[in-house]
């Protein structure tokens, strides 16, 4: 590993430990040339994932977009940022488990709605109203009836 101080390619690992909930390894290194100590992180490189938008365009998967959407839906609700992060992690893991290179924005939205329905009814309705693009009250009513039917089954 190249030293950020002297740019020589001679360093040794002096400490390694798990980081980021075991999704990375943090390594403390020391340059054998100048003695400078620095930290590196090793992570699994995930294959690129493309999202196919409704208009057919493709863009790189961005978990922050999902997080922003669920944060907007969960405003002023008793939902912690940790719960929202876990929800987005679960959605991303479900997507990656499928082993696809592309996924439609519709499929992502359906996964998010499924997770939100289990977390908070109001956040689910808020997200659904944007995602499904309700044109009138009947769209809201249909989503409410779906939610009420789910509760009746429980």
Curated annotation (Swiss-Prot):
Which top-level group of life is the source organism from?
A: Bacteria
Task: Using the UniProt annotation, give all residue ranges assigned to the region (Disordered).
Answer: 1-22
Q: Which InterPro entries match?
A: ATP-cone_dom, NrdR-like_N, RNR_NrdR-like
Q: Which PROSITE patterns match?
A: ATP_CONE
**Record's cofactor remark:** Binds 1 zinc ion.
Domain ATP-cone, first and last residues per copy? 49-139
Q: Name one GO molecular function term.
A: zinc ion binding
> What cofactors does this protein use?
Zn(2+)
Q: What are the disulphide bonds in this sequence?
A: none
Question: GO:BP terms for this protein?
Answer: negative regulation of DNA-templated transcription
Q: Where are the zinc fingers (unnamed)?
A: 3-34
Keyword set, alphabetical order: ATP-binding, DNA-binding, Metal-binding, Nucleotide-binding, Repressor, Transcription, Transcription regulation, Zinc, Zinc-finger
Answer yes or no on keyword Repeat. Answer: no
Q: Do you know which NCBIfam families this protein is assigned to?
A: transcriptional regulator NrdR
Q: What is known about what this protein does?
A: Negatively regulates transcription of bacterial ribonucleotide reductase nrd genes and operons by binding to NrdR-boxes.
Family per similarity comment: Belongs to the NrdR family.
Protein name, please? Transcriptional repressor NrdR
User: Its encoding gene is what?
Assistant: nrdR
């Amino acid at each position: 590993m190249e030293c950020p101080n002297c740019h020589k390619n001679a360093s040794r690992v002096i400490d390694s430990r798990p980081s980021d909930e075991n999704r990375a390894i943090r390594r403390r290194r020391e340059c054998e040339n100048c003695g400078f100590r620095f930290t590196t992180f090793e992570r699994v490189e995930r294959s690129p994932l493309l999202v196919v938008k409704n208009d057919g365009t493709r863009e790189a998967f961005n978990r922050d977009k999902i997080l922003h959407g669920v944060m907007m839906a969960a405003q002023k609700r008793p939902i912690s940022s940790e719960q929202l992060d876990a929800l987005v992690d679960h959605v991303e893991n479900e997507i990656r488990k499928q082993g696809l290179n592309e996924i439609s924005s519709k499929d992502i939205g359906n996964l998010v709605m499924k997770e939100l329905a289990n977390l908070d009814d109001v956040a689910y309705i808020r997200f659904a109203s944007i995602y499904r693009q309700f044109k009138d009250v009947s769209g809201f009513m249909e989503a409410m009836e779906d939610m009420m039917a789910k509760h009746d089954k429980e």
